[in-house]
Amino acid sequence: MHTTLPESTSENFEYYDLAEACDMGDIVALGTVFVVILYSLVFAFGLVGNLLVVFALINSQRSKSITDIYLLNLALSDLLFVATLPFWTHYVINEQGLHHATCKLITAFFFIGFFGGIFFITVISVDRFLAIVLAANSMSNRTVQHGVTTSLGVWAAAILVATPQFMFTREKENECFGDYPEILQEIWPVILNTEINFLGFLLPLLIMSYCYFRIMQTLFSCKNHKKAKAIRLIFLVVVVFFLFWTPYNVMIFLQTLNLYDFFPKCDVKRDLKLAISVTETIAFSHCCLNPLIYAFAGEKFRRYLYRLYRKCLAVLCCHPDHLSFSSSLSESQRSRRESVLSSNFTHYTSDGDASILL
């Protein structure tokens, strides 16, 4: 079984040297309950939040910016990822498992969405670095066309990096697992874990940390009353990414060591198995926070949610005329406020998009 996929419910024992059996039955049962509940919550909140981002960007009447392109692709990556969670929930509670084609396809979507989401978070960090720290030099490159080209490259990279994770996946006796060739059985799981640790965590974290550190240096040198909020949001982005993904990646690293029998005691193996189930769910729930951190903290997304709320209220309360009139007034007021806000930021960003600071 891949390290980031739900563990099989039928593998209740693990065997080691001297034919010693390590009973995992209670850990598997507890992990199954935990995974089913939290995967369902992550799916529900992740689906709603990221769909709102997609609808807000598509329905926005303003011209699209490069930031919008990246936010849209981040939301699509998260949607692709959370769309697989009901299948894994079904897998851990149903003895029939998944059909071969479904097993292969869902595993592929899972890892493409997994790496795609992290890669787009990293790209957004680099884009903000270019927009704020290198504003003058990057102005001509930060176009929508450039954003589309970069996004296609990120998707290609996500597919390429995800391929080793699902290329050997198959269904056998109601189990969806990695069936590696004999020559690769020992080294391939190590390669997969190392790929997740490095390309899925360490490298993105280093890039994000550098970009946001340089951004904060630039903001501290600017005399602007909005910079305190921007710095808090930047700090939030890095801290949330670190807190949600670090425990899981530590467990993946310990699991790699376990492949070399660094933890011979059964109790340690049991604790590690449970810890992976807990920390992976915490890490996966990060996709529920992406809309809040990257999108809804921006003015345009709050405006969209407000308009959506008023439309729903109009339908429920049967006062469409009144709400339409007040909405037009508030839209005019928001437009004036937006123009003032935009002018406050254009002196140190290359596109004047306030969301670039989030």
Swiss-Prot record:
In this UniProt entry, the residues modified to Phosphothreonine are 349
State the PROSITE patterns in the record.
G_PROTEIN_RECEP_F1_1, G_PROTEIN_RECEP_F1_2
Q: How does it sit in the membrane?
A: Multi-pass membrane protein
Question: What GO molecular function annotations does the UniProt record carry, in alphabetical order?
Answer: C-C chemokine binding; C-C chemokine receptor activity; C-X3-C chemokine binding; C-X3-C chemokine receptor activity; CX3C chemokine receptor binding
Disulfide bridge positions per record: 103-176
Q: Which GO terms describe its biological process?
A: adaptive immune response; antifungal innate immune response; brain development; calcium-mediated signaling; cell chemotaxis; cellular response to lipopolysaccharide; central nervous system maturation; host-mediated regulation of intestinal microbiota composition
Give me the Cytoplasmic side stretches, as residue ranges. 48-68, 127-147, 208-232, 297-358
Extract the InterPro entries matched here.
CCR1-9-like, Chemokine_CX3CR1, GPCR_Rhodpsn, GPCR_Rhodpsn_7TM
Keywords of the record: Adaptive immunity, Cell membrane, Disulfide bond, G-protein coupled receptor, Immunity, Inflammatory response, Innate immunity, Membrane, Phosphoprotein, Receptor, Transducer, Transmembrane, Transmembrane helix
Topological domain ranges for the Extracellular compartment: 1-26, 90-105, 169-186, 254-275
Gene Ontology CC, one term: external side of plasma membrane
Keyword Cytoplasm on this protein?
A: no
Listed transmembrane segments: 27-47, 69-89, 106-126, 148-168, 187-207, 233-253, 276-296
Q: Summarize the PTM comment.
A: This protein is not N-glycosylated which is unusual for G-protein-coupled receptors.
According to its UniProt entry, the function of this protein is described as: Receptor for the C-X3-C chemokine fractalkine (CX3CL1) present on many early leukocyte cells; CX3CR1-CX3CL1 signaling exerts distinct functions in different tissue compartments, such as immune response, inflammation, cell adhesion and chemotaxis. CX3CR1-CX3CL1 signaling mediates cell migratory functions. Responsible for the recruitment of natural killer (NK) cells to inflamed tissues. Acts as a regulator of inflammation process leading to atherogenesis by mediating macrophage and monocyte recruitment to inflamed atherosclerotic plaques, promoting cell survival.
Q: Which family does it belong to?
A: Belongs to the G-protein coupled receptor 1 family.
Q: Assembly and partners?
A: Found in a ternary complex with CX3CL1 and ITGAV:ITGB3 or ITGA4:ITGB1.
Name listed for the protein in its UniProt record = CX3C chemokine receptor 1
Q: Which gene encodes it?
A: CX3CR1
